[in-house]
């Protein structure tokens, strides 16, 4: 690992971004499947 003090590692940013995207897409599809997509 390189010196990451004071700087966020790119793999952490990628992991968090991936989780957020998957979460948002999952909530969107779950809402549409439950018939709540119109209320969102």
From Swiss-Prot:
Q: Topologically, how does it sit relative to the membrane?
A: Single-pass membrane protein
User: Entry's InterPro entries?
Assistant: PSII_PsbJ (IPR002682), PSII_PsbJ_sf (IPR037267)
Q: Which HAMAP family match?
A: PSII_PsbJ
Family per similarity comment: Belongs to the PsbJ family.
Sorted alphabetically, the keyword list is: Chloroplast, Membrane, Photosynthesis, Photosystem II, Plastid, Reaction center, Thylakoid, Transmembrane, Transmembrane helix
Q: Where in the cell is it found?
A: Plastid, Chloroplast thylakoid membrane
Q: Quote a single Gene Ontology cellular component term.
A: chloroplast thylakoid membrane
- Top-level taxon in the UniProt lineage: Eukaryota
The organism's taxonomy opens as: Eukaryota, Viridiplantae, Streptophyta, Embryophyta, Tracheophyta
Q: What does this protein do?
A: One of the components of the core complex of photosystem II (PSII). PSII is a light-driven water:plastoquinone oxidoreductase that uses light energy to abstract electrons from H(2)O, generating O(2) and a proton gradient subsequently used for ATP formation. It consists of a core antenna complex that captures photons, and an electron transfer chain that converts photonic excitation into a charge separation.
What name does the UniProt record give this protein? Photosystem II reaction center protein J
**Main localization of the protein described in the UniProt heading:** plastid
Membrane spanning stretches: 8-28
Gene label: psbJ
Q: Summarize the subunit comment.
A: PSII is composed of 1 copy each of membrane proteins PsbA, PsbB, PsbC, PsbD, PsbE, PsbF, PsbH, PsbI, PsbJ, PsbK, PsbL, PsbM, PsbT, PsbX, PsbY, PsbZ, Psb30/Ycf12, at least 3 peripheral proteins of the oxygen-evolving complex and a large number of cofactors. It forms dimeric complexes.
One GO biological process this protein is involved in is: photosynthesis
């Amino acid at each position: 690992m390189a010196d990451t003090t004071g700087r966020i590692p790119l793999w952490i940013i990628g992991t968090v971004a991936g989780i957020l995207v998957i979460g948002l897409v999952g909530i969107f599809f779950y809402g549409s499947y439950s018939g709540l997509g119109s209320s969102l």
